[in-house]
Amino acid sequence: MEIIKLDHITKQYDDGFVALKDINLELESGKFYSLLGPSGSGKTTILRIIAGFTEASAGKVYFDGQDITNLDASKRHINTVFQNYALFPHLNVYENVAFALKLRQRPESEIREKVKDALHTVRLDGYANREISELSGGQQQRVAIARAIINEPKVLLLDECLSALDKRLRKEMQFELRAIQKKLGITFIFVTHDQEEALAMSDEIFVLNDGEIKQSGSPVDIYDEPVNDFVARFIGDSNILSGRMIRDFAVEFAGKDFECADAGITPGEKVEVVLRPEDLDITAPAAGKLLVTVQSQLFLGDHFEIKAIGQDGFEWLIHSTNGVQIGQEVGIFFDPEDIHVMRLGETEEEFDARLETYEGED
């Protein structure tokens, strides 16, 4: 069931800067969505328009089928967890979480019960009387979430709310946020520039750049099938090579012809080819599909990050559980399904239509 719809949303500021360009998206109830992109991509502007903090220059915002474009933020069934959490330092945990209910003059017995339930949901039982200054960053974030969910919103917006935490806490809170969302069954819209966060938590990701949605889909679809150079580079590490389509399921790059899994592209058309570093296997030279010479390697704990130069001068990035010798010539092997072919300038709609066409011919 659709809960949020943005219909041809544009945002242009007084100085002429266009932050959003004809944004269209539909969000279903009870899912975890991420708006992913670099600084200035428009992701936070979308969040603020949904929340009612920023007015769109054009277009409509719908909530549960109702036009809320001009509805005051305080009247929307939407709450926000801000990047800095926006907790009141002079109030303790209980008072922070209870704040919205006290403003609405709810009975004290109801407030106590709801604060207890909210703190239990975020695993802060026994913290009600703690001062905010006594809490860790992760605990402060949980208080902010408890405060945001206490009045049972239908949608929770989270604006870069993991960015201030260290790596270990960020990982921990990824699991926490996903668990909270599933327990509550409400729609989460999470803004981030961190592709790992988006991939780990989301049901669906919207990748933004320059005020436009470049691609949307499940984490697996976006990682395995990027529609353009920007998405391929922004979502994970990639080897991106210039190539030429030979025919359906055959492509040329690095001076050789390879079997691939792509079709629906004109024979002879120039394309870009994506190979993920973790899909490349290091072999003996004779067993590889291409030969490369190792230039450097870094041990990153669970794998080696290896840079190597191909015979055509292309610099390859390879992730391997086995180390190699600097200067060593090795082979690299990959399967046809590991090769992803991108048409130059193809939109997401054109990519989807092509995919449906050749999959329908199987």
Curated annotation (Swiss-Prot):
Domain ABC transporter span(s) in chain numbering: 4-235
Entry membrane topology: Peripheral membrane protein
GO terms for MF: ABC-type putrescine transporter activity; ATP binding; ATP hydrolysis activity
Ranges in coiled-coil conformation: none
EC number in record: 7.6.2.11
A UniProt-annotated Pfam family: TOBE_2
Main location: membrane
Enzyme class: translocase
Subcellular location: Cell membrane
Quaternary data: The complex is composed of two ATP-binding proteins (PotA), two transmembrane proteins (PotB and PotC) and a solute-binding protein (PotD).
Protein name, entry field: Spermidine/putrescine import ATP-binding protein PotA
Gene: potA
